[in-house]
Amino acid sequence: MNNGILLNCQNLTKDYIEGSVTTRVLKDVTFSMNDKELVAIVGSSGSGKSTLLHTLGGLDQPTSGEVFIKGKSLQKASQDELAKLRNTYLGFVYQFHHLMADFTALENVLMPMLIGNQNKTEAKDRAEKMLNAVGLSHRITHKPSALSGGERQRVAIARALVNNPALVLADEPTGNLDHKTTESIFELIQQLNEDQGIAFLLVTHDLNLAEKLNRRLIMQDGVLRPEM
């Protein structure tokens, strides 16, 4: 896509149906994001933030509307094409790190590349590089239980970066962290954005964190609007 547009969506709606009750959680959402941009979506619990993020990342399908990554429609892609788009362009970070407890930090970061059948030696080198980039080169042999909350989230960020994504979608990445650790995670995001040109779209309830990003959007009752 031209003009540096990395991600955009047009007229997204999302309905959940329980019995005879239909609840619309996304209401005609239109949004775009440029290469290398840092964007925050803020809003109260239940406003539709996480649903939007999952839909933008192709993890959930909209009821209507369309999502484009680098001009390619997620809704028109086959399952194989969708997986390739996600693996090529996107990384994901969640509030709960979802690390595998029985594996070391290095093995956790390696996993997406091994699933993608990448060369094991090259994958290991890449994983070590990413752990070094997030400041954990000295902790690569530690399992999640031996890491602090901030360290576990750094491992999760490293895992999101191993396939060299253009965009990381982060759902409350600092939600379980104290203020000091939150600050360090934000500094890491800034550094990765500046050094590697990675764009970040953060869903967060932390207004202090959101204010530090390039752009802020507000989600309220399924409607996305610019910050006033």
Curated annotation (Swiss-Prot):
Q: Which InterPro entries match?
A: AAA+_ATPase, ABC_transporter-like_ATP-bd, ABC_transporter-like_CS, ABC_transpr_LolD-like, LolD_lipo_ATP-bd, MacB-like_ATP-bd, P-loop_NTPase
- Name the keywords, alphabetized: ATP-binding, Cell inner membrane, Cell membrane, Membrane, Nucleotide-binding, Translocase, Transport
Which amino acid positions bind ATP, per UniProt? G43, S44, S45, G46, S47, G48, K49, S50
Q: Where is the ABC transporter domain?
A: 7-228
Q: What is its main location?
A: membrane
Q: Where in the cell is it found?
A: Cell inner membrane
GO molecular-function annotation terms? ATP binding; ATP hydrolysis activity; transmembrane transporter activity
Going by the entry's taxonomy, the superkingdom of the source organism is recorded as Bacteria
Q: Which NCBIfam families match?
A: LolD_lipo_ex
Q: Tell me its family.
A: Belongs to the ABC transporter superfamily. Lipoprotein translocase (TC 3.A.1.125) family.
Q: What is this protein called?
A: Lipoprotein-releasing system ATP-binding protein LolD
Species name: Mannheimia succiniciproducens (strain KCTC 0769BP / MBEL55E)
